[in-house]
């Protein structure tokens, strides 16, 4: 069913409450301070080769944090972290050590037959029994963990796609897969407290060819106080998995195929003979979120957060261009945050400051797993119960293939998932000020790209805070050195930023904050 967009926007304008239908001339005045020329100035610095791709924990990211802090200071933003613009994010890097794996009398080779994702705690042990849990799914319609106590056990599961019977998922009952992808299964298994997880990946060989250098480098995790160390994970080939299961007289793929054909779990303890040593090298990592505050007036205790991640993926060893500059991802969003900070501080200086306070938040660690925003959401500088909205900007400087003939667009994700008020405000501000084509393709919970889970707004939404994610879509230079400043459409970067500005202006100045009144149809667990 198609919506009549004109009627919908008119209805939204009538329903949003105390905001006038006509343009707010004061808002327009300060929105016009967001320019393509200023955007170019900031992005040319942040996405320069000097910043070496801004990888979290590396000198380029530290330089970016210093630049953003200096901009906030020059604008006169309040430094909200005990007089600083920097919030330390406690990260550690866990790099794989010289791990070994032997099953029976056969020794297997690291980064050929298996690879490890290590924990902060080394694991060296002889294993006489593993608990085979099939696909590792724990769903009310298909529960392979029912009745199992996995705490302290060694668990073996397959990362193969969930079982389908007669072309239909045994979980959804349709041709569409459930949310139980391999990452969700692993997180759920980790929550059960096993001593070690052995993960069979049928694509191990191709993954090693494609990602060998990445898999041999360290991964970053939050070093949360009082958090128990997660189990190490050994990802193994079919040959290794079959050797572990040798006493069952069955291969791992025949066992999972039997589960798929019957639609019934077949979890069981299996006797085996495994000797393994999973070793790691742990080191502390320097990383910071950067934030500055424009304090509100009569509603200053309520906070609107405008965010973007300033980190990217750093350097590459391949090709002649070694720097993944990340001009669009997410230099463009960080630039948008800086531009809006300038516009709001100019308004405040001239007596038109916002009623609610606005926190401009540039986070680190997004490319490592949304780590900076996760830390902020769990250790907030301002109470989450007083945080009324998060407007998150991640990639707003390019045009994707779908819109090559109409660049005047932006994807919006999440505006209607927690608050009907926020969605109406968003529709109204666009219709009144920027008139971009709003594309809601990625707002569908069934969209396979799962964009909703892939940027920092997620860590606010999971705490029940209404969010909007602004995004230009994926393009051919995504996560490549060719994501350069020269390819940015600065006219569109500025226009999309103005949409976020006008939305923030409305939220910050209205009598009542957006009410949480919608049950989110995106599952909470990504």
Locate each region found by the language model.
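Noncatalytic luminal/extracellular "stalk/propeptide" segments of secretory-pathway proteins
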Residues: 52-167
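Soluble metallo-hydrolase cores and metallopeptidase-like ectodomains found primarily
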Residues: 24-27, 110-113, 117-147, 226-326, ...
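Second-shell loop/turn segments in exported
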Residues: 25-33, 49-59, 74, 87, ...
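His/Asp/Glu-rich mid-to-C-terminal helical/loop segments that flank catalytic regions of hydrolases
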Residues: 335, 342, 475-526
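Metal-dependent peptidase/peptidase-like ectodomains
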Residues: 108-109, 231-236, 241-250, 363-469
């Amino acid at each position: 069913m198609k919506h009549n967009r004109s009627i919908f926007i008119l209805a939204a304008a009538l329903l949003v409450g105390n905001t006038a239908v006509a343009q707010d001339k004061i808002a327009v005045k300060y929105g016009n301070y967001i320019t393509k020329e200023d955007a170019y100035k900031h992005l040319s610095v942040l996405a320069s080769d000097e910043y070496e791709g801004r990888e979290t924990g590396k000198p380029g990211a530290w330089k970016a944090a210093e630049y953003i802090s200096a901009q906030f200071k020059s604008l006169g933003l309040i430094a909200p972290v005990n007089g600083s613009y920097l919030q330390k994010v406690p990260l550690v890097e866990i790099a794989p050590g010289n791990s070994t794996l032997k099953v029976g009398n056969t020794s297997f080779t690291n980064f050929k037959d298996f690879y490890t994702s290590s924990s902060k705690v080394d694991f060296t042990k002889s294993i006489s029994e593993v608990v085979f849990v099939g696909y590792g799914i724990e769903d009310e319609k298909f529960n392979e963990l029912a009745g199992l106590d996995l705490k302290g056990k060694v668990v073996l599961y397959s990362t193969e796609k969930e079982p389908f019977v007669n072309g239909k998922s045994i979980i959804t009952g349709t041709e569409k897969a459930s949310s139980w992808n391999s990452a969700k299964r692993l997180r759920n298994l980790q929550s059960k407290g096993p001593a070690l997880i052995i993960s069979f990946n049928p694509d191990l060989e191709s993954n090693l060819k494609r990602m060998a250098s990445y898999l041999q480098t360290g991964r970053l995790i939050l070093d949360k106080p009082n958090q128990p160390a997660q189990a190490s994970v050994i990802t193994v080939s079919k040959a290794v998995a079959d050797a572990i299961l040798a006493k069952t007289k069955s291969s791992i793929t025949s066992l999972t195929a039997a589960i798929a054909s019957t639609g019934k779990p077949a979890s069981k303890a299996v006797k085996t003979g495994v000797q393994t040593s999973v070793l790691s090298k742990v080191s502390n990592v320097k990383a910071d979120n950067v934030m500055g505050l424009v304090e509100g007036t009569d509603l200053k205790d309520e906070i609107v957060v405008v965010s973007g991640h300033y980190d990217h993926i750093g350097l590459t060893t391949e090709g002649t261009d070694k720097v993944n500059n990340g001009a669009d991802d997410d230099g463009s969003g960080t630039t948008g945050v800086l531009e809006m900070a300038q516009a709001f501080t100019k308004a405040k200086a001239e007596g038109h400051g916002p009623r609610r306070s606005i926190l401009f938040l540039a986070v680190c660690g997004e490319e490592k797993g949304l780590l900076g925003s996760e830390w902020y959401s769990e250790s907030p500088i301002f109470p989450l119960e007083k945080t009324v909205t998060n407007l998150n900007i991640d990639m707003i400087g390019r045009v994707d293939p779908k819109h090559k003939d109409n660049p005047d667009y932006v994807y919006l994700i999440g505006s209607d998932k927690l608050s009907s008020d926020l969605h109406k405000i968003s529709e109204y501000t666009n219709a009144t000020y920027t008139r971009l084509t709003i594309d809601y393709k990625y707002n569908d919970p069934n969209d396979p790209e799962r964009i909703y889970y892939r940027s920092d707004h997620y860590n606010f939404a999971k705490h029940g805070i209404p969010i909007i994610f602004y995004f230009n879509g994926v393009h051919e230079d995504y996560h490549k050195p060719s994501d350069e400043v020269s390819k940015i459409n600065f006219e569109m970067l500025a226009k999309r930023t103005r949409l976020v500005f006008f939305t923030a202006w409305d939220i910050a100045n209205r009598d009542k904050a957006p009410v949480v009144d919608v049950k989110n149809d995106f599952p909470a667990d990504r």
